[in-house]
Amino acid sequence: MLLSFAACSQNAKPAAKPDQPAQTETADSKNAQAETAETENVQIPNPWTDYDSKDDAVQAAGFDLTVPDKISGCSEKSYRVLSADGDVMFEIIYASGEDETARIRKAPGADDVSGDYNEYAETETVDAGGVSVTMKGENGLVKLAIWTNGDYSYALSVENAIGQSDMAALVSNIQ
């Protein structure tokens, strides 16, 4: 048995060892790394502005939001307005200390303004004071109501689910 080996001689770089990456860098790859490091620290500004009073929030939003005095026994409210890219949304949050009880939103248009993207086991459309309201929840209780009335969209979400008639009563007091 006769074996023959042939090889060509060239000035080639030695291959990287399998457990070590090749150490070749170009100016473009260094620039890309620098840009990535810079953009990792960039943050989008918060589009929400908090207001000390409802009157200040109404002035900023350009429209009023009528709400119940209390929801689930909670009357402490905070007022916020989102203003971004020509869109405006007025939000009132009911909270007891750090614990949020409910959130009401109103914005011009007919889109869902709830910001709630959860999947609910039950969705039903009901009449609440002459307005068609979509209610979402589970086990016969509701956590989210969304509706339109006139030129505005509304959303009411509650932390602790409530009965459909209780949600309808709250919705009928929101304008």
Model-flagged regions — what are they?
Residues S4-A7:
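C-terminal motif of bacterial Sec signal peptides marking the signal peptidase cleavage site
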Residues K13-P45, Y51:
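Low-complexity, Pro/Thr/Ser/Glu-rich flexible segments characteristic
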Residues E38-V142, N149:
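Short, solvent-exposed recognition patches
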Residues G150-Q175:
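Surface-exposed amphipathic alpha-helical segments
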